[in-house]
């Protein structure tokens, strides 16, 4: 990653993350997406970073969002698209904006198909298994580049 200052971050939440708080709490915890976004905003405020959060169940909407990003850094939880979306991978690579891949659950302790990511090899880093704290850790990493 270059030494450029990070002033703005976009957080992208992939499919089904709008169901957090009710969907498989054993894997994803009990926090809702709104609660996670509130924590992200609070962390960004402390770090004096502008942050935008975005969630979609649509691959096309996520692609369009990535294409339009003017931020310095991306934090993405591609969710189920982790294992299927070459197009999102290509969009992230094309933007040349550094990003961290985040997963709420430990994908390596789950089904074998979840262990393959189309994003990890081009990401600055991957955070998996720390619940909502993973987003905050990624934001702290971006903030230290300020």
Question: Where are these predicted regions, by residue range?
Answer:
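Extreme N-terminal starter segment of soluble prokaryotic enzymes
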Residues: 5-9
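Mobile beta-alpha loop/short-helix "lid" or hinge segments that flank ligand
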Residues: 10-16, 104-118
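Glycine- and acidic-residue-enriched helix-capping/strand-helix junction motifs
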Residues: 20-34
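Short acidic/histidine-rich motifs immediately flanking catalytic phosphotransfer sites
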Residues: 68-74
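Mid-chain, well-packed structural core segment of small domains
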Residues: 74-108
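Short, glycine-/small-residue-rich phosphate/pyrophosphate-handling segment
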Residues: 109-146
